[in-house]
A protein has these predicted regions:
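Alpha-helical bundle segments that constitute or directly flank the non-heme di-iron/ferroxidase center
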Residues: 12-18, 26-63, 80-84, 130-137
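Generic serine detector
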Residues: 2-8, 34, 49, 56, ...
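Acidic, low-complexity proline/glycine-rich segments
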Residues: 1-23
């Protein structure tokens, strides 16, 4: 990656750290409304449930065995067993008051659809390292 270190990538990511976003600050401060949390939980479930497909797409394009094995281990963490990530997120969404229909069939906000499309493009098109960076960040 011509002079770019993992440390420098981590520093770039830290500038945009998730917990710096106003939504997460409101959540941390206890000022986030229950309605906003429910909407977030239902929307984010779409991304969490799609995440294993991002890994699968990247795994299928990767030629490096060691990297493929790491992706496979991550995919197992995402999907295997009853404590898989989509199931855990679903339980969280239900715990904050989302109904099954809100989680599964509710309207997908344009921002959510855009994020999912961006991840799908990052892992399916261009260099594999681009997809790895998207999953890492």
């Amino acid at each position: 990656m011509s002079g770019i270190s993992l440390t420098s990538i981590d520093a770039l990511i830290a500038e945009k750290h998730l917990l710096k976003h106003p939504f997460y600050r409101a959540w941390q401060d206890g000022t986030l409304t229950s309605e906003a949390l429910r909407d977030y939980a239902a929307q984010y479930y779409r991304h969490v449930s799609a995440f294993p497909t991002y890994i699968s797409a990247l795994h299928s394009r990767c030629e490096d065995l060691e990297t493929r094995q790491a992706l496979l281990a991550n995919l197992r963490d995402e999907e295997e067993g009853p404590e898989n990530h989509p199931a855990l997120w679903r339980r969280f969404a239900e715990a904050v008051g989302c109904s099954a229909s809100e989680i599964d069939a509710g309207d997908v906000q344009p921002e959510t659809a855009g994020a999912i499309a961006a991840f799908r493009a990052a892992v399916a098109e261009g260099p594999v390292v681009r997809g790895l960076a998207a999953l890492y960040a």
